[in-house]
Amino acid sequence: NVNLERVHVYRSGGMSLIAEYSKDITVKEFSTAAHAGSPRMITSSADATHFVNCKGQVKLENCQFESMLDDATNIHGIYMLVDTLLNSNVVRASFGHFQQEGNYFAEPGDMMRFVDKATLKPVGQGKLISIDKTDRKSYVIETEFDASAVDAPAGLAIENISCDASAVIRGCTVRYNRARSLLLSTLGDVLVENCEFKSQMSGINV
């Protein structure tokens, strides 16, 4: 469990808070507002908070997100693109963006879902048996799913559906930022209540 309470970030050169492959995160009274009277127009040059491939629940309560150049929060998983079928249930898969390289992604026992990368429609799933991360750009992934049964295995992507956290966002204020307030693409249950959004783009993007 991770608990952050009464944390004030007055300036950050990137994201103010980022969590990857963590579980059950609670953030209370977190602020990216500038000091009172400060002439500063920008506090965080990217997202205020960002949660990637997390498990359990992400909870944001009574937070004040101001003057970011991106979202107040972004909660999502990660896809890996299947490059090569090495065996019926073993594939080599790579990340779609260089900033994802080296991501922890999964551990044995996690549930892997295979999707058509053109449509993102599921084609099958199975538990992860083993994962070789020797190459930080591409991993060798062994699962219980027979990928050879798919017509075009190279047209697949893999997501770790054990890492789609639910989210509770309550009593938060978002304002003076140029992007969205909440970007929520997790598969988990989401509750947003008693919040105020004054962002340049959409308040809630699901």
Please place each PLM-identified region on the residue numbering.
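A structural detector for beta-sheet-dominated domains
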Residues: 20, 52, 76, 94-96, ...
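Short glycine/acidic-rich loop motifs that flank beta-strands on beta-rich extracellular proteins
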Residues: 13-19, 35-47, 56, 69-75, ...
